[in-house]
Amino acid sequence: MHDQIIPCGMLVAIEGIDGAGKTTLARSLALKLRGVGLETVVSKEPTNGPWGTLLRQSAVTGRFSPEEEVDVLLRDRRQHVEDLIVPMIGRGAVVILDRYFPSMVAYQGAAGLPVDALLEANAFAPRPDVLLLLDVPPVIGLQRIWERGSTPNHFETTENLSRCRDIFLALELPSKRVIDATANAETVFSAALGLVMEVLRVRLGALGAVVLERLAG
């Protein structure tokens, strides 16, 4: 099956607090989209590049200040945008991101930095065609972290995640769609796929009827 080209590509960002189910949804969406012939790339932030790796190390050691984390995050994101996001959407692919700039706004905002300034610092980052916000209460997110065998890091507390959740929900981004992620993975996937299909229906037009029919099947 030849890949179906999407005019101007498509950028899907999946957001939410830790334990919301972002990685699971990203993988499920990619599998579905690839199955109907859409070239699909899954990436994440922080990336596996040098800046992203440095940041993940700091999440364990806690040695970076919020301001230092912002600097590293922005360096990582600029490289991500230039090396992967822009080239892939430019060739008509679907790019699915497991976290993007709203995570920086929420997490660094929860650490006390001004949300408006954080949004302005990310003005260079392409805006998602659809931003899927998986919403769960912090107590559920933390429970899921423990259930998958992980240990919450120094920031993953009920209080901090509550502040992050509030910022996520308050962000005024035109493509943001909130999904109740307390539901099971199948229900969340179905809701997310429907929202992605809404954008594809506009992008692909009549030529995409077959693709949309397969996605709905």
UniProtKB/Swiss-Prot annotation:
GO terms for molecular function: ATP binding; dTMP kinase activity. One of its GO terms (biological process) is dTDP biosynthetic process. Keywords: ATP-binding, Kinase, Nucleotide biosynthesis, Nucleotide-binding, Transferase. It holds the Pfam family Thymidylate_kin. SUPFAM superfamilies: P-loop containing nucleoside triphosphate hydrolases (SSF52540). GO terms for cellular component: cytosol. It catalyses: dTMP + ATP = dTDP + ADP. It comes from the Bacteria. Transmembrane segments: none annotated. Belongs to the thymidylate kinase family. HAMAP family: Thymidylate_kinase. Phosphorylation of dTMP to form dTDP in both de novo and salvage pathways of dTTP synthesis. This is Thymidylate kinase.
